[in-house]
Amino acid sequence: MNITTKTIQAQIAKGAFKPHTALTNIALAYYQNASNYFAKALFPVCRVPQSSDNYYVFNKEDLLRDGWDRKPAYGQTSPVPVSEHTETYACKVDQMIMGIDQIRQTDLERRQGPALARDPRQQRARTIAEQANIHQDKLFAKSFFHAGVWDNELTGVDSTTPGEKEFIKFTNANSDPIKFIADLKLSMQRETGRTPNKMGIGANVFNALRHHPAILERVKYGGATANPAQVTKNVLAQLFELDEIVVMLSIHNSAKMGADAEMEFIGDPDALLLVYAPDAPSVDEPSAGYIFAWDMLGDGNILPISHYDGAPGTHSEYIEGLMAYDMKKTADDLAIFCKGCV
């Protein structure tokens, strides 16, 4: 059959011809909401010019001691020392590479489709950045947000008479989360001179707090019929008298390539971490933790993404991402980890 433009138009009109193209205004891509990620929300990010180095730690006991004394006649008081020591960090380089098949890409470009399909470099760069967020959250959870990391660790129990280093789970109606957190804050203030200002909570903890009777009682008169009171992160932060509450909502697929998906929250959904940490690196403030980020190119970009061609004859090209972090616990006494909150 001799196919002409007119015959194709006639087949399209009859619905017999379906052109092999893709929609340009829709595609499905499970990129997560940026607000779900938590790795850089609790602890300050310190950009460093070397992959490893030292930093000073001044002795807490010396700084918080009263060094003043009554001056003796014709004499002087003894000089007061402030001791210090150094700790180290070491950023390890992680890498992600994605490929582009130029022959396959030719077909995709001719089929039209959305811009991301026609511009694979942009799509690969975005995917690398997205999975960098997932990787950073996994590093954070491994370094800071699980049992056995912090000296100050408490365990939730169903009993209304908790023992030492135990507390009543928030799913128990007899619990009082507001007083519990207030007591923890006061204990840290007594030991360090710093009151916790941030708290990271798992997804199930957030859900339990939002529906806890003691918290609902505090906010029930704050709304109206058209705009009922809601327990949000900001409301919880105000009730707990904290600068910020970070809800750990990011997820990842823990299954290997080719296996059935195993979706799960990255941060322990049943835990919380109460900390003191400044918003930015400081030379006269302590912090429970720091995220050291190596500026390997020296241009301020801590996630450099580059493009290069594949070997001759492969008709391929690659997009590469690099990053180097050390997520380090820097002050054990400025954090309290609570597991099994629900």
Name the predicted role of every residue range.
Residues 11, 105-120, 152-166, 171-175, ...:
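Intrinsically disordered, low-complexity coil segments
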Residues 1-29, 33-41, 47, 301-342:
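Protruding loop/beta-arch "assembly-hinge" segments enriched in small, turn-prone residues
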Residues 93-100, 317-323:
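Oligomerization/assembly interface segments of phage tail-like spikes and tubes
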Residues 42-49, 210-222, 278-309, 333-335:
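Surface-exposed flexible segments
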Residues 32-99:
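Assembly/oligomerization interface modules of large self-assembling protein complexes
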Residues 194-291:
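Extended oligomerization regions of viral-like shell subunits
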Residues 117-127, 131-133, 218-219, 234, ...:
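A binding-site-centric feature that preferentially detects glycan-recognition modules on secreted/surface proteins
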Residues 104-195, 203-221:
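Alpha-helical scaffold segments that mediate packing/assembly in large oligomeric complexes
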